[in-house]
């Protein structure tokens, strides 16, 4: 059964850096929502045509399943119902949630070095809105992994539920 790994965390937490490295090192298809904004709008900074962007994103996830491939999803998935959509809409995958936790100031600092900068007030709102995954809240996931990002050094992954994904059995260097 194909596996879906969904990255979860606030902008600037390190989701894209980590998911890109995992995908490259393990031959997993990486699907990032910002890449679909770039594809549809010609620029990842243009957050227009949202409906079309998400339709294309979800269609590519479905194509990944049809092809029997594993995928890693790079999106914020800040709240429970956003995360549940991946399980409800794509029930034929094994579902693995990877939460990256980082101090708010580090997220803001990382954000400043990105091409597509998220305003600080939006990052603050994300932090207020964030529902950190728990075994109780996110009980439908096959596994939940917690990773702390300290000064852009990812700490040893910990399991909240289930087993750690296989790619965390070795050191990941960015």
Label the predicted regions.
Residues 1-2, 64:
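Phosphate-binding P-loop
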Residues 2-4, 8, 13, 21, ...:
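Conserved GTP-binding G-domain of TRAFAC-class P-loop NTPases and closely related GTPase folds
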Residues 2-6, 29, 70-72:
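Residue-level preference for the first positions of well-ordered beta-strands
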Residues 4-6, 53, 97:
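Anionic, Ser/Thr-rich low-complexity intrinsically disordered regions
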Residues 16-69, 106-108:
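Conserved substrate/cofactor phosphate-moiety recognition/catalytic segment
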Residues 28-30, 95-97, 143-146:
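Conserved beta-strand scaffold positions in the cores of enzyme catalytic domains, especially
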Residues 39, 65, 77-118, 129-134, ...:
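ATP-dependent NMP and nucleoside kinases share a basic, alpha-helical "lid"
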Residues 51-58, 80, 101, 120-127:
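Amphipathic alpha-helical transducer elements in NTP-driven molecular machines
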